């Protein structure tokens, strides 16, 4: 409370006393006590208290300067890598896009610890091995590049120390994992430099864009929210400038029906690419070309990628350049993600013969959809050669739960979930499992879990797939 406000309150109390017949000199000025706001409680330092799936993304919170919070597992990580299987899949994805004539740009965000470590308190700052983290982050960028990806180096944005005039324009929010619009802009400038050097950019039509402030947004941070759940505290809303980008010379909604539908650069990514941060707008401004943004909030690592690859837009008009933005918090060895992405890049079972197929109405419980040998002949259906294409009549279906049975009695339970925020078409495409010794398994049957109540129409096809070869030396990267 400011001294000025305290004086006003004291004067008000005195006037009230006078009106009640009491002498002002007998009235004491009000007293106030101020406690430090929002220091984390002991529970926030106990990983076992992070019980929900959502809370476990924030294990464990660390109080920093002011309202700044950090996560020890994600923000203060020093390791940036994946498993040999993850590197192999990344190579396959690159090669699959290359076959489609698409060049990939990987925007691998630096962590909040790398960028805003100067906001840590002295003890935590000393404990965080910044040099190790930075070295490993840069090594991961080189690994992406060694596989053929175009990789903007965002490491110059680390160890941020803003000038006095730029205070409040931090790269990341104080209590949220997202970058601010100012952070998005700084990243976009570096990404644009990388795009300009790509041969694929040479034939892309140029266009001038300009960006203006469009208002202010209030950010209730996700880290602050979790701290509130654990400690019962609340943090102040952080207000930040918002921006909008439009073609130079345009006004209002002039570009609503412009040629952005013919963009030859597409952005897929996480909620960092959402409208609030204007990352796609800054990309348009600094690249100097239309960018189609298909990212959506809550999409995670793969949500917008899978939705886009299954779209008519990608199938008929694949971009020359695909910018893929994601953060190090996502594991890059999640087999079910790569199986879906590679299956969609191979067009599922569109326009190719089905080795097995079925169309039926599902009932609650397990439904036997396809059986190898039902016609009297058992086919040699080996996992490494196959992919599955499942289509529900109801496009709003976002979960496929199924069981794949094999001739030797083994089975795989698979569950594919699309984000609640995604615009789905009811289609699920995935390659058959090939990690460990699954590649040589021979398929016997395919069961699908039906709805909780009522019925659900579905059709499924099993077909041969293309194999995207991986050079042996690249598949071993990171070992």
From Swiss-Prot:
Region SGNH hydrolase-like domain, annotated ranges: 24-349
GO MF annotation list: acyltransferase activity
Pfam families: ALGX, CBM_26
Main location: periplasm
The protein's Enzyme Commission number: 2.3.1.-
Coiled coil: none
Subcellular location field: Periplasm
Family: Belongs to the AlgX family.
Function comment: Plays two roles in the biosynthesis of the exopolysaccharide alginate: protects alginate from degradation as the polymer traverses the periplasm, and also plays a role in its O-acetylation. Probably has acetyltransferase activity in vivo.
Name of the protein this chain belongs to: Alginate biosynthesis protein AlgX
Organism: Pseudomonas putida (strain ATCC 47054 / DSM 6125 / CFBP 8728 / NCIMB 11950 / KT2440)
